[in-house]
Amino acid sequence: MGSFSIWHWLIVLLIVVLVFGTKKLKNIGSDLGGAVKGFKDGVRDGSTAPADPAQQVTANKSADANTVDVEAKQKS
């Protein structure tokens, strides 16, 4: 009595099909499959090493010469 037999599962399946309908179950299955595929693609993309190493950005000296350092005064 601890486990369900095949007949129990078939009756449950029949009730689910009658309640939701085959079209709704088909849509749920395709949505679930798309979600699993998206998850696998996300995991695969996150585990790959970057192909191109990041390049160091050099400071533009002409822009630094024109920069003015100011302090904001607090309005009283």
From Swiss-Prot:
Assigned keywords, A-Z:
Cell inner membrane, Cell membrane, Membrane, Protein transport, Translocation, Transmembrane, Transmembrane helix, Transport
UniProt lists compositionally biased (Polar residues) regions at 55-65
Topologically, how does it sit relative to the membrane? Single-pass membrane protein
GO BP terms in the entry: protein transport by the Tat complex
Task: Name the InterPro entries on file.
Answer: TatA/B/E, TatA/E
Physiological role: Part of the twin-arginine translocation (Tat) system that transports large folded proteins containing a characteristic twin-arginine motif in their signal peptide across membranes. TatA could form the protein-conducting channel of the Tat system.
Q: Which HAMAP family match?
A: TatA_E
What is this protein called in UniProt?
Sec-independent protein translocase protein TatA
